[in-house]
Each structure stands twice: as C-alpha cells, then as structure tokens.
Amino acid sequence: MSHLVKMENGQSQTIQEMLGCIERYNPDHLKTLEAYVQDQAKNNTYDLEANLAVLKLYQFNPHMLNIDITYTILLKSLTSLPHTDFVMAKCLLLPQQMKDENVQTIIDLADILERADFTLFWQRAEVNRNMFRHIAGFHDSIRKFVSHVVSTTFQTIRKDLLKELLGGIEDSTLESWIKRNGWKHQGQGLVVVAMQDDKIKTKNITEKIEFDNVGGLMAQCL
C-alpha cells in the first residue's frame, strides 16, 4: 500500500521524500507514519528510517504516544538482527515506554537473542505469542538470524539440536532451511554447516605506494 503525506501547500509527497526534509518532524504526519508501520507488520516489509522517525515524534510529542505502535516497531527491529536496529530504536524510547511491561518483555527477548540462547527464546516466544501474532514472517525472520549464527559458529551440528535452535520445527520445515542455507546431511544425524574449503584463508595483499604519496612525509622526517 502506498502512503502519501499531505503537505501544507496541498501537494503530496511519498514517505521517503518527506523523511528527507524538515517535514519528518511535523506531528501532523504521525498518523500516516503509524499506518505505514502497521502495513510493514502486515505485509512483511521493513523501513527502519520511517520507524525511527515515529519514535522521534513520540519524543517530541509524548501526548501522541501510541504504545501498540511502539511494540510493533521494536518487534520489527528484532527481525533485522544481526543489525543494530533494535539498539537504535531502544535509545529513542521515552521513560514511560521503558516502564511498560510489554516493552520490557520485548527487551528481554532481544537480550536472549543477542546471547544466542535460542532454546530459551522460543520458550519465551511461545508464552508471549499473542504479542507478535500480527507481525507477518516474524518467526522465519528470527530463524534467519539463528541460521546466521549457526553458520558462523558450527562446522557440523546434530540434526536434533538444529531443530531445537530453529524453534522445534518439523522435519519437512527443517529440510527447507537446510536447503535454503546450502547445508548438507552427513549421516548419523549430523548436518554439515561449513565445509573445510569454506574456512577463511589468509591472503597476501600487495599495495603499490608511489613516492609522490610519501615524499612530503619523508621530507618532514629529515
């Protein structure tokens, strides 16, 4: 869905155009931005800049705070891990937002993910499943982050452990994630995450430095 922002001169701008000018701080545009946040949740899209603009408007206009939109922005920022979007969003929260019980729950979930305690995360996620039921693709976005961590941590991993880390998924779903990440079955209940040839290899880099680039520096040393 396309969201247009109505300017005082009667013209319309896209949200991206509005965010590039001083109009991003105009509270008259807050309702449009909040609707845009809801569309991101519904359609599994993501716009960090717009979401941070909403939180900034809440800072300037605390009386306009919508706590449900705050939840959605924080949860959407979790779906972008391992990027630091959640930290940026958290830094813009008002004291009244930080005191909210659901906000604290989301912060706890973020801490658990950052510690890579995925088994605990899925347990807490199940208890609080109603909180992000409206976020399309939330679970798969977290599984994508889990896959990233697994790929950078393991060479081989037990199939049963991998299923647990991905949220206790079914075998058929596990197969799709194995295929998606380019992993391979090794037998004996093991999954190969990284082949020996995929290990980081050292590389010699030769840089040619011209005399003109260092002549001035050498002259100063004389």
From Swiss-Prot:
PROSITE patterns reported in the protein's UniProt record: PCI (PS50250)
GO molecular function: ribosome binding; RNA binding; translation initiation factor activity
Keyword Lyase: no
Gene Ontology terms describing biological process: formation of cytoplasmic translation initiation complex; regulation of translational initiation
Membrane-spanning residues: none
SUPFAM superfamilies found in the cross-reference section: ARM repeat, Winged helix' DNA-binding domain
UniProt-listed InterPro entries: ARM-type_fold (IPR016024), CSN8_PSD8_EIF3K (IPR033464), eIF3k (IPR009374), PCI_dom (IPR000717), Transl_init_fac_sub12_N_euk (IPR016020), WH-like_DNA-bd_sf (IPR036388), WH_DNA-bd_sf (IPR036390)
Principal subcellular localization: cytoplasm
UniProt keyword annotations, A-Z: Cytoplasm, Initiation factor, Protein biosynthesis
Cell location: Cytoplasm
Record domain PCI: where: 46-208
One cellular component (GO) term of this entry: eukaryotic translation initiation factor 3 complex
Keyword hit for NADP: no
Entries under Pfam families matching the protein: CSN8_PSD8_EIF3K
Described purpose of this protein according to its UniProt entry: Component of the eukaryotic translation initiation factor 3 (eIF-3) complex, which is involved in protein synthesis of a specialized repertoire of mRNAs and, together with other initiation factors, stimulates binding of mRNA and methionyl-tRNAi to the 40S ribosome. The eIF-3 complex specifically targets and initiates translation of a subset of mRNAs involved in cell proliferation.
Subunit note: Component of the eukaryotic translation initiation factor 3 (eIF-3) complex. The eIF-3 complex interacts with pix.
Family: Belongs to the eIF-3 subunit K family.
The protein, known as: Eukaryotic translation initiation factor 3 subunit K
Organism: Drosophila erecta (Fruit fly)
